[in-house]
Amino acid sequence: MENALTARDRVGVQDFVLLENYTSEAAFIENLRKRFKENLIYTYIGSVLVSVNPYKDLEIYSKQHMERYRGVSFYEVSPHIYAIADNSYRSLRTERKDQCILISGESGSGKTEASKKILQYYAVTCPASDQVETVKDRLLQSNPVLEAFGNAKTLRNDNSSRFGKYMDVQFDYKGAPVGGHILNYLLEKSRVVHQNHGERNFHIFYQLLEGGEEELLRRLGLDKNAQNYQYLVKGQCARVSSINDKSDWKTVRRALSIINFNEEDIEELLSIVASVLHLGNVQFASDDHSHAQVTTENQIKYIARLLAVDATAFRESLIHKKIIAKGEELNSPLNLEQAAYARDAFAKAIYGRTFSWLVRNINKSLAYKGSDIQSIGNASVIGLLDIYGFEVFQHNSFEQFCINYCNEKLQQLFIELTLKSEQEEYESEGIAWEPVQYFNNKIICDLVEEKYKGIISILDEECLRPGEATDMTFLEKLEDTVKNHPHFVTHKFGDQKLRKSLGRDEFRPLHYAGEVNYSVVGFLDKNNDLLFRNLKEVMCDSGNPIVHQCFDRTELTDKKRPETVATQFKNSLSKLMEILMSKEPSYVRCIKPNDAKQAARFDEVLIRHQVKYLGLIENVRVRRAGFAYRRKYEIFLHRYKSLCPETWPNWDGRAQDGVAVLVKSLGYKPEEYKMGRTKIFIRFPKTLFATEDALEERKQGIATFLQARWKGYVQRRNFLHMKHSAINIQSWWRGNIGRKKAAKKRWAVDVVRRFVKGFIYRNNPRCPENEYFLDYIRYSFLMNLRRNMPKSVLDKSWPVPPPSLQEASELLREMCMNNMVWAYCKRISPEMKQQLEQKVVASEIFKDKKDNYPQSVPRLFINTRLGNEEINTKILQNMENQALTYAVPVVKYDRKGYKPRRRQLLLTHNTAYIVEEAKLKQRIDYANLTGISVSSLSDNLFVLHVKCEDNKQKGDVVLQSDHVIETLTKIAITAEKIHNINIIQGSIKFIVGNGKEGIIDFTPGSELLVAKAKNGHLSVVAPRLNSR
């Protein structure tokens, strides 16, 4: 906590005890304001936590924050609700004494949220097991259920607790939460039937209508519109922007399941809730005798079905009153006003009893399941008191009177225990106690609860006396009995000024929190809390198990008059005070910053009023009764030892002696401090502040010194580490190199030995002596083969294999060739395939037979040498639509005279055509083509031999083509005459016609020459090429 003192000017001090002007209310408020502005909502008064409701979500409740406070000393961290929770838990574990945390403050100050945060802290930080996790879940989930049935929106608070709650959380010897128990106090049942303007009924009604499933609402006879129910419209505030009833409904349903309510229990519980809504819609009318009669029969049927009672009996119980006089039973009819009273009384009774049943069943779910007596005996508890805050409304009635009486008792307990704990600490430390003046509210508690003369006793007496007792007769008796009390006044005994602010039906006690006007209207009815006997009888016969448990039949036979509500509440408070007095208390005082429920708004007038009536200034004065600050010697010495040369850096003696030396060095004056048995007490905050400022200055020098030492240490550590690492690396590397060399030598010797032996036995069958050598030879050959593989099918190179691998080498060679061929074939296109097929045919026919064949090999064969535009369309039409496969320009030599003429040779699938421009000169069917002759020289002439029996034919045809190899290959393939091509050396004879024969003489020469010789032959001179 001392760490925050350096920022005290901006964010205030974390402990009000450290305020210099601690008696100043303005200084107190200003410190609250500074912290509230910085979202620091928690501040200490010694061990008391003051909490200001921020009215917004703050990022200070995560698991990381919980871990920060877990197991840490109370003053080592900033103020927080978790610090209070952890301090109580650690005290429970170490001292084995039951603890309690008292949360107080006015309505809307955040008490309920504080209790939930404490439960969440225990759920997260305490030891866990499967059983413990179940208990944790049930403890946490009991909150939304109780809030739904016991909380409501008021003018001051959208989630105001309308009942008091004290919860014991039980822990086993390991510190794990293993059970719990809840006590509830004074549920505000009147809210069921009436709400002030701007307020709502209990949350559960709106949650059921807004979030309930259609089928559920149908079974309960409800619809979603809250405006249709009389008990929900009186406050004219059914919807609230800050409340999500639909989402809350899902939370409540899930919570009911977690705390062990089955579906039947939930259905029966909701049936009662729905019956209350229907009950509010029951209407009456007067008959001729002014007796009340029910006019809404449907509502009666719904209620009877939901509560599982007889409809007729229930209707009669609402409009008649059973009176037992001298052993005789009489049914007295009710008028309209009485019937409405009976209806509302029953609604309040059944809701109040159902709430009590709900708490009892939650307690069964939370009950400690210790398996043996020892386990039960070792269980300790931490109590959480979340009870209604002090309330002052425009109209204050019986409920506000009871609530404020409860707050008076808690304030009295707080003062007593605070003073007591302070006095005990001073006495245990051997320091004289200085009495503190404070307002003792015992006089107000006595005004309310004193026997015979207290307000409760007078109210009970008026309720029980025979005759016509009314609220006004109660007020008159109150005035007669306590009119002289200094803290009590009524309109009758007030002065002129006071009477203007006090009604004739009101009385005003002076509470510790201020004056409150209470209207006595309804005091007697609410205190009696009467329910007509015949309504009880009908409910005792209910088939709804919950209703049956809520209305015990012994009530009908018990002759003893039940205690009044006020007396029950007083007795419950007395028992609660005993419980709290038996435990070690911790306090959380909650403050509401404004009435508008707005974030970041600080209403100084409202806060000053709360600070005053909560007695916070008195609390600071008690804590500062002589000394503002106290710490154990060990903690004080550890923090401030650097300020004294004799205690820095370490003190070897007792901590108390070290502190004595330290404060002497700091120059503390005797009146500024006292030395206790285990603690040092500092009287003035300025003394502590001066010490803290000196420490902050000293920290700078220490930080510089530590930085220098640390940097030197780090550099030396790094150097030594590097040196050590270098030596290790050198050592390892040398060893590694040496080991590698030795291993290599051993390996080399072994290899040489095996290699030599293998060489000697290399020609023997495989055996241990030669297997290494043979493997090496095989490996070497394969590696050499891998590097020298043929690159194409034309590459015939192949490494020479060793004798032992001859057969394997041939197989590999064949596989390699097949693979290359397969890969090559896979890559070629259909066009290239056709080209190769033609080239293969050309090779078969002309290779090594005709001189100009080699020049044709690298040249691609063209599909046609003439385009369609070069061939006359009439010719194409005369071809009888035969598909043209090849066309080439040629030179035709006449049979007589051998005159050359330009022609076109056109090939189809069945016929060859010789064409002269637009005239078809000759048609040669392939069937009549007997052969083809060509010379072996480099000329381009060839002869097509045709059968002469066909009159259409004119004899053989002599042609010349510049692409003779391509042309003849195409003819051979198309006409299927591959084996009919004759390559002739010397002369070629051919038929001219009419049985005559022509001769072509081929002779080698220097250049190509075609001419008619003198002997009548066609002479062809062709150069001889060396390529063949």
From Swiss-Prot:
Biological process terms in GO annotation: actin filament organization; actin filament-based movement; endocytosis
Cysteines joined through disulfide linkages: none
Residue ranges of domain IQ in the record: 699-728, 722-751
Keywords from the named record: Acetylation, Actin-binding, ATP-binding, Cell membrane, Cell projection, Cytoplasm, Membrane, Methylation, Motor protein, Myosin, Nucleotide-binding, Repeat
Domain of life: Eukaryota
Domain TH1, residue spans: 850-1024
Function: Myosins are actin-based motor molecules with ATPase activity. Unconventional myosins serve in intracellular movements. Their highly divergent tails are presumed to bind to membranous compartments, which would be moved relative to actin filaments. Involved in egg activation by coupling dynamic actin to membrane.
Record PANTHER family: MYOSIN (PTHR13140), UNCONVENTIONAL MYOSIN-IC (PTHR13140:SF255)
UniProt name for this protein: Unconventional myosin-Ic-A
Organism, scientific name: Xenopus laevis (African clawed frog)
